[in-house]
């Protein structure tokens, strides 16, 4: 049976450098590499600063092991999930329960965006569409019905909380935010609520920096002028999507030389890949923090939200049951649809044969052909009515064996053959072979001639 499987690399097992080294490629390349695989029917890739997750639909549940090897990721930082585990994880993820900052809103937006990206690329289908539509719906419901997203609930706001904790408050401090994308906006808005002296926004696209700075009463800075701004900043929080360092050791070192020697500089890097070169931490009067340092803030937030998390868990378990029922109905609907198509193909062929035989004796008009059409249509529907009812009941009861047998009897599903081929390719003994269904209906109709 074709089902969802997934592989997850996240902050729970991997450090920031391990997540960076797990995947260096672009999203398009990975999506198409997955989708072009013979045994993968659908795929979605989620890549954020805290995780790399791959969801595929395949008759082989072990298909992602080979991709993990290709990525060069160490297996000790990867979780591999089967169908049921993948669904539960995805709903938990959308609900904010898998985030470093439990209940954060940002992850739901990222899921929407990355799912839409895969959908536009043409790599999704009915199975993943159903899962991701449900996940997005559940994420919204959890935030509407619980208080899990109240307070400091994003990487951006957690970075600001970390700066406050390290500096014993931000009052009178000058803060430079590098990046005016989603993370940068979250950081800047969290800072705007603090009693800081000034906020500076630097971005590759200067217009975006100007717009955000204007909204928050700050100052826009061109990315090329960041080194100059470092001379005056107390805190720098960087969260761009750049594939290279924004602040190299050389840039920071030059800025430090022009600063008051007793003045310390706090750098917080919340980008993945990282924006700030690691060796910057070796410089005098510089403290460098990254995503791993946010775990302390995350743990404090988690304690405050345990009760809300319990409510979210209850919603997820309720929605998982509904999602599984939806999949069961879809399985029956697919078999029923294929069965109707098969019977209707026979109906059309036999109707044409009947018309041709009648035409051999005398001319027939539209009335006669309409009667034949109605007759064969009615017979087909009456024959299929009871099987349709029974198949839907079996699906709702979770009787997969019954559905499998029905599909085999009528030669409807090809995934079983494909799964057996995969096992055969892997050297696994295949004891059961699918009967030859080629032109089975033709043989039935030929026998009736």
From Swiss-Prot:
<dbReference type="Pfam" id="PF00745">
    <property type="entry name" value="GlutR_dimer"/>
</dbReference>
<feature type="binding site">
    <location>
        <position position="99"/>
    </location>
    <ligand>
        <name>substrate</name>
    </ligand>
</feature>
<dbReference type="GO" id="GO:0019353">
    <property type="term" value="P:protoporphyrinogen IX biosynthetic process from glutamate"/>
</dbReference>
<keyword id="KW-0560">Oxidoreductase</keyword>
<dbReference type="GO" id="GO:0050661">
    <property type="term" value="F:NADP binding"/>
</dbReference>
<feature type="site" description="Important for activity">
    <location>
        <position position="89"/>
    </location>
</feature>
<dbReference type="Pfam" id="PF01488">
    <property type="entry name" value="Shikimate_DH"/>
</dbReference>
<dbReference type="GO" id="GO:0008883">
    <property type="term" value="F:glutamyl-tRNA reductase activity"/>
</dbReference>
<dbReference type="InterPro" id="IPR036291">
    <property type="entry name" value="NAD(P)-bd_dom_sf"/>
</dbReference>
<dbReference type="InterPro" id="IPR006151">
    <property type="entry name" value="Shikm_DH/Glu-tRNA_Rdtase"/>
</dbReference>
<comment type="pathway">
    <text>Porphyrin-containing compound metabolism; protoporphyrin-IX biosynthesis; 5-aminolevulinate from L-glutamyl-tRNA(Glu): step 1/2.</text>
</comment>
<comment type="subunit">
    <text>Homodimer.</text>
</comment>
<feature type="binding site">
    <location>
        <begin position="104"/>
        <end position="106"/>
    </location>
    <ligand>
        <name>substrate</name>
    </ligand>
</feature>
<feature type="binding site">
    <location>
        <position position="110"/>
    </location>
    <ligand>
        <name>substrate</name>
    </ligand>
</feature>
<feature type="binding site">
    <location>
        <begin position="179"/>
        <end position="184"/>
    </location>
    <ligand>
        <name>NADP(+)</name>
    </ligand>
</feature>
<keyword id="KW-0627">Porphyrin biosynthesis</keyword>
<feature type="active site" description="Nucleophile">
    <location>
        <position position="49"/>
    </location>
</feature>
<protein>
    <recommendedName>
        <fullName>Glutamyl-tRNA reductase</fullName>
        <ecNumber>1.2.1.70</ecNumber>
    </recommendedName>
</protein>
<dbReference type="InterPro" id="IPR000343">
    <property type="entry name" value="4pyrrol_synth_GluRdtase"/>
</dbReference>
<dbReference type="InterPro" id="IPR036453">
    <property type="entry name" value="GluRdtase_dimer_dom_sf"/>
</dbReference>
<dbReference type="InterPro" id="IPR018214">
    <property type="entry name" value="GluRdtase_CS"/>
</dbReference>
<dbReference type="InterPro" id="IPR036343">
    <property type="entry name" value="GluRdtase_N_sf"/>
</dbReference>
<feature type="binding site">
    <location>
        <begin position="48"/>
        <end position="51"/>
    </location>
    <ligand>
        <name>substrate</name>
    </ligand>
</feature>
<comment type="function">
    <text>Catalyzes the NADPH-dependent reduction of glutamyl-tRNA(Glu) to glutamate 1-semialdehyde (GSA).</text>
</comment>
<dbReference type="InterPro" id="IPR015896">
    <property type="entry name" value="4pyrrol_synth_GluRdtase_dimer"/>
</dbReference>
<comment type="similarity">
    <text>Belongs to the glutamyl-tRNA reductase family.</text>
</comment>
<keyword id="KW-0521">NADP</keyword>
<dbReference type="Pfam" id="PF05201">
    <property type="entry name" value="GlutR_N"/>
</dbReference>
<dbReference type="InterPro" id="IPR015895">
    <property type="entry name" value="4pyrrol_synth_GluRdtase_N"/>
</dbReference>
């Amino acid at each position: 049976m074709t089902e969802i499987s997934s592989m997850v690399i996240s902050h729970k097992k991997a450090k920031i450098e391990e997540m960076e080294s797990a995947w260096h490629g672009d999203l398009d390349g990975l999506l198409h590499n997955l989708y072009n695989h013979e045994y993968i029917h659908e795929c979605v890739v989620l890549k954020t600063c805290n995780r790399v997750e791959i969801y595929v639909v395949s008759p082989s549940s072990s298909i992602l092991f080979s991709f993990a090897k290709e990525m060069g990721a160490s297996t000790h930082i990867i979780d591999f999930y089967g169908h049921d585990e993948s669904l539960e994880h995805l709903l938990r993820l959308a609900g904010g329960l898998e985030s470093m900052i439990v209940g954060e809103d940002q992850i739901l937006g990222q899921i929407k965006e990355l799912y839409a990206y895969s959908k536009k690329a043409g790599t999704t289908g009915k199975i993943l569409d159903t899962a991701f539509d449900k996940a997005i719906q559940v994420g919204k419901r959890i935030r509407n019905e619980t208080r899990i997203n109240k307070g400091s609930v994003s990487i951006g706001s957690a970075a600001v909380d970390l700066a406050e904790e390290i500096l014993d408050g931000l009052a009178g401090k000058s803060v430079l935010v590098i990046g005016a994308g989603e993370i940068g906006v979250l950081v800047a808005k969290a800072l705007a609520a603090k009693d800081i002296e000034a906020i500076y926004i630097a971005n590759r696209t200067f217009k975006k920096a100007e717009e955000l700075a204007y909204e928050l009463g700050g100052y826009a800075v061109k990315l090329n002028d960041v080194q100059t701004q470092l001379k005056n900043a107390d805190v720098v929080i960087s969260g761009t999507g750049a594939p290279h360092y924004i602040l190299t050791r050389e840039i920071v070192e030059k800025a430090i030389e022009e600063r008051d020697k007793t003045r310390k500089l706090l750098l917080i890097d919340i980008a993945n890949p990282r924006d700030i070169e690691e060796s910057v931490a070796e410089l005098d009067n510089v403290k460098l923090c990254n995503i791993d340092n946010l775990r302390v803030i995350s743990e404090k937030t988690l304690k405050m939200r345990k009760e809300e998390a319990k409510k979210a868990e209850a919603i997820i378990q309720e929605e998982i049951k509904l999602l599984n029922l939806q999949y069961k109905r879809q399985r029956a609907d697919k078999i029923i649809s294929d069965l109707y198509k098969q019977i209707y193909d026979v109906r059309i062929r036999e109707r044409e044969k009947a018309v041709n035989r009648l035409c051999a004796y005398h001319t027939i008009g539209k009335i006669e052909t309409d009667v034949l059409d109605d007759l064969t249509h009615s017979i087909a529907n009456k024959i299929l009515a009871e099987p349709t009812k029974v198949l839907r009941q079996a699906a709702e009861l979770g009787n997969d064996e019954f559905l499998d047998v029905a599909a085999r009897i009528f030669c409807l599903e090809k995934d079983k053959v494909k799964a057996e081929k995969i096992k055969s390719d892997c050297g696994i003994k295949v004891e059961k072979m699918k009967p030859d269904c080629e032109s089975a209906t033709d043989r039935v109709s030929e026998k009736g001639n």
